[in-house]
Amino acid sequence: GLGSLLGKAFKIGLKTVGKMMGGAPREQ
């Protein structure tokens, strides 16, 4: 559903931000 799509996009966004910030350690 829409919720799962948003959740997936959010996780991808966090990964992208982490790479941009210099590879911050994962949380969750």
UniProtKB/Swiss-Prot annotation:
It comes from the Eukaryota. The keyword Mitochondrion does not apply. Signal peptide: none annotated. It is found in: Secreted. One of its GO terms (biological process) is defense response to fungus. The keyword Transferase does not apply. Expressed by the skin glands. One of its GO terms (cellular component) is extracellular region. Keywords: Antibiotic, Antimicrobial, Cytolysis, Fungicide, Hemolysis, Secreted. Peptide CPF-B1: Has antimicrobial activity against Gram-negative bacteria E.coli ATCC 25922 (MIC=5 uM) and multidrug-resistant A.baumannii (MIC=4-8 uM), against Gram-positive bacteria S.aureus ATCC 25923 (MIC=5 uM) and methicillin-resistant S.aureus and against fungus C.albicans ATCC 90028 (MIC=25 uM). Has some hemolytic activity against human erythrocytes at high concentrations. Belongs to the gastrin/cholecystokinin family. This is Caerulein precursor fragment B1. The lineage of its organism: Eukaryota, Metazoa, Chordata, Craniata, Vertebrata.
